[in-house]
Every structure is written in structure tokens, then in C-alpha cells.
Amino acid sequence: MKPLAKLFMVFCLIGIVLSRPMPEGEEGEGEEESPDDASGDETEGGEEKTDDGASEDGGEEESKADEEDGGENADGEDAGGDDAGGENADGENTDGENTDGENTDGENADGEDAEGSKDEGDDSEGDGSKEESTGGDEGGDNAGGGEGGGENDPVNTYHKVVAILDKDTKVDNIQSEYLRSALNNDLQSEVRNPVVEAISRLGSFSKIEGCFKSMGSDVKKVIDEEQKAFKDCMTKKKSEYECSEDSFASAKGKLSPITSKIKSCVSSKGQ
């Protein structure tokens, strides 16, 4: 039993010794690392610091470069703005000069237009005065032809003959519309047109004036005869149209001799 008790005691002592806490000095010695491990750690830390420092230096250099680039860009933009402003200013001056030139041209054009209009107005006034003077001369010639009858003016002769025909061959006083239309057609085709054609080239009315003295009375006689015949026809219970056709055919045969006499007279005296 004693040996067992001693062995038990030994184990108890060992357990007590093992269960006791370690002193701080011993723990520090245990925790101390070997020089190689420490140098390795320091080397790694130095490399990390070096990398950090290099990155920081690189960042500072990049920031400085960016600032310098920004300054140059700003200077370039300012310079470009100044150049652009100068160009704009020059452009404005140029535009102003062109504008002045255009205004000057416009004023010149207006002046030329005004002068042209004045010249045209003067020309038109001159033409108007010439026409008036010409018209006055023609009027004088016509007046002279009417008074003396010796002017060689075919136009004046034509107007005088037409006036005589209109005066001596009127049928406006005939009441029947059918008879009036029929006799008017006869006078137009048998008297007016042939006489006008006969005197178209004659210049002196005084030479042929005597050819128309009896024309008015001769035509009036034919018209009166046809009116009487028309009334007699209506008493026979014929229609107004039928009676007018009878007068139309009869008057044509009576007017032709009158026209032939006038044309013969004009032809003989007008030469």
C-alpha cells in the first residue's frame, strides 16, 4: 500500500505542478520568436511600406500631372476664347462694313430708280405733248378740210360720207319691227356698204359732195313707198312677216339705182 500511496502522491504533485499558471516572464520568453522569423516579418513589413510609399508617391505625381494638364487646358481654352472673341469681333466689323456697303448700294439703286422714273416721266410728258400737238394738227387739218374742202384727207371724207348716210337712210320712225329690220338690211347692203367702198381712196370731199345732194330724198321716197305697200298688204290678212318680206324684195330693187348713180358720180368727180 505504501508504494501505491507514494505513486499517487507523485502523480498528485505532477498534476499540481502542471495545473499552476505560468509566470509572465516565462510566457514572454515562450512567445519570443526566433530572429529569423522577426527579420522575415520586418522584411515583409518594409516591403509593404515600400509598396505603400511608392503607391502614395505615384498618386501624388499623377495628381500633380493632372493639375498641370488642367492648368494647360484652362490656359488653352482661355487663349482659344480670346482668339475666337477676336475673330468674332473682326467678323462683326466685316459684317458692319458689308452692311454699310449694301446700304450704300441700295441708296444708289434707289437714286438710279428715282432718276429713271423722272426720266420716264419726262419722256412720257414729252410724248404726251407731242401727241397733243399732233392731235391739234390733225384737228386743224380736219377743220380746214371741212371749211375749205381742199385738204387731201381720206379719213375726213369717209366720216363726212358716213354722217350723210346715217342722216338720210334712217328707218327709226317705222313702227313695225319686221318692216324696219327688212328695210335696214336693204339700206346696209345696197347703199351704205357700196358707197363707203367707192369713196375709200378719195381725199377731197369737196369734189364729191354734190353726188350726195339727192340721196336723202331718193331714199326717203323708197321708204315711204314701202311703208304704204306694207299697210296695204296687212289689209289683205297676211302676216306681218310675209308683208315685211315683200317690202324687203321690193326695196332692194329700188335702192340699187340710187347707189349706182352715186358711185358713177364719185368715180367721175373723184379722179
Swiss-Prot record:
Residue pairs linked by disulfide bridges in the UniProt entry: C211-C265, C233-C243
Domain of life where this protein originates? Eukaryota
Entry keyword set: Allergen, Blood coagulation cascade inhibiting toxin, Disulfide bond, Hemostasis impairing toxin, IgE-binding protein, Secreted, Signal, Toxin
Name where it's found.
Answer: Secreted
Q: Which Pfam families does this UniProt record tie to the protein?
A: Aegyptin_C
UniProt GO molecular function: IgE binding; toxin activity
Q: Where is the composition biased (Gly residues)?
A: 141-151
Query: Is Disulfide bond set as a keyword in this record?
Result: yes
* Tissue expression: Female salivary gland (at protein level).
Disordered as annotated region, ranges: 21-155
Q: What family classification does the UniProt entry report for this protein?
A: Belongs to the aegyptin family.
Described by its record, this protein's role is as follows: Anticoagulant protein that modulates blood feeding of female mosquitoes on vertebrate hosts.
**Record's protein name:** Aegyptin-like protein
Origin organism is Aedes albopictus (Asian tiger mosquito)
